[in-house]
């Protein structure tokens, strides 16, 4: 079959196509594709192509929403440190109105702003977007720009 007594062919590859160092002829390691990811999409350090490991955190300890590992446990994000009550944790996606009221950092926002936020948050698409996407960014957006819409 062309394999020597160690199981390697004349090019130095075993029957699975890997050499003694565990690389195939394209230079990829056993179990990893040419981009360095395994069948589950993680590379050898445990991060997927988005830079997240199997628990959903990247090398900086943030998940895809930008929340650190402490977020789950303590309800704090790295960005806002432990001095702030977490802005989203206690509320589900249908509770934006009271969330905004109770936890607004913009103490000076007027009634008009507040009503606009409530009204806007009732819109299904917006609510979905707000819930699913980057809370950190949205949070800043709301507050930096006042109405923000």
Swiss-Prot record:
Annotated region described as Disordered, given as residue ranges: 105-149
First and last residues of every Sequence repeat: 1-5, 6-10, 11-15, 16-20, 21-25, 26-30, 31-34, 35-39, 40-44, 45-49, 50-54, 55-59, 60-64
Annotated spans, 13 X 5 AA approximate tandem repeats of Y-G-Y-[DE]-K: 1-64
Basic residues bias locations: 125-141
Keywords, in A-Z order: Repeat
Biased composition (Basic and acidic residues): 105-124
Entry protein name: Putative eggshell protein
């Amino acid at each position: 079959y062309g394999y020597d007594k160690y199981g390697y062919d004349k090019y130095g590859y075993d029957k699975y196509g890997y050499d003694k160092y565990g690389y195939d002829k394209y230079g990829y390691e056993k179990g990893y594709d040419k981009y360095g990811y395994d069948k589950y999409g993680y590379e050898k350090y445990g991060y997927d192509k988005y830079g997240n490991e199997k628990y959903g955190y990247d090398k900086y300890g943030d998940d895809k929403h930008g929340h650190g590992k402490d977020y789950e446990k303590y309800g704090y994000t790295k960005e806002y440190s432990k001095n702030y009550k977490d802005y989203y944790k206690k509320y589900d996606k249908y509770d934006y109105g009271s969330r905004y009221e109770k936890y607004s950092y913009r103490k000076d926002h007027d009634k008009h702003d507040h009503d606009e936020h409530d009204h806007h948050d009732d819109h299904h698409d917006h609510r979905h977007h707000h819930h699913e996407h980057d809370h950190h960014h949205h949070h800043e957006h709301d507050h930096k720009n006042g109405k923000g819409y």
